[in-house]
Design a protein with these regions (language model features):
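Domain-level signal for Mg2+-assisted phosphodiester chemistry and nucleotide/NA-binding surfaces
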Residues: 1-100, 150, 154-157
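Nuclease catalytic cores that cleave nucleic-acid phosphodiester bonds
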Residues: 78-158
């Protein structure tokens, strides 16, 4: 039986679903989603979910917290947190300033866990659910350093 670890870019998945207008899928069972991509000779041994806690508005943060609390009840499921960095933007037309937030560290966290798991022989196959091109380098590194291991990319909608 081949061991599979799923690496899920939660931010990327959410925004892919949102861009398609697929709100009904926001509350996915992430492990069941990952299992849909397995072959009969493969076993999901761990799911790593990468996200960043929403800062504002409060209602979005509350909904995300409830979702993350539900995910924490799943066996062999780990949540890895990045962060949002704030940036003050000034409108070129009217001069109004506002704060915007940029998600940071998700791709770095995925890269670190992917390389750590590969080097410690925790998987035979890595299932990478993300469309982030910043992960091409780490995927190539795993393929180069651990040629017996496979990395399968699954792209979220959007």
């Amino acid at each position: 039986m081949k061991r599979v670890i799923a690496y899920v870019d939660g931010y990327n998945l959410y925004h892919g679903l949102k861009s398609k207008g697929w709100k009904r899928f926001y509350w996915l069972d992430i492990q069941k989603l990952a299992q849909q991509f397995l072959k009969p000779d493969q076993k999901l041994v761990k799911t790593r979910y990468f996200t960043t806690v929403v800062k504002q508005p409060d209602d979005k943060r509350r909904r995300q917290t409830v979702f993350l609390d539900a995910l924490k009840t799943l066996p062999d499921f780990t949540i890895h947190f990045g962060q949002f960095l704030s940036e003050i933007i000034t409108c070129r037309v009217c001069g109004h300033t506002y704060t915007t937030y940029h998600e940071k560290m998700t791709d770095v966290n995925i890269s670190v866990e992917l390389m750590t798991d590969a080097s410690q022989d925790r998987f035979d196959i890595a299932l990478l659910l993300s469309a982030d091109s910043d992960l091409v380098g780490p995927v190539k590194a795993v393929q180069r350093l651990f040629p017996a291991k496979r990395v399968i990319a699954v792209f979220p909608p959007g």
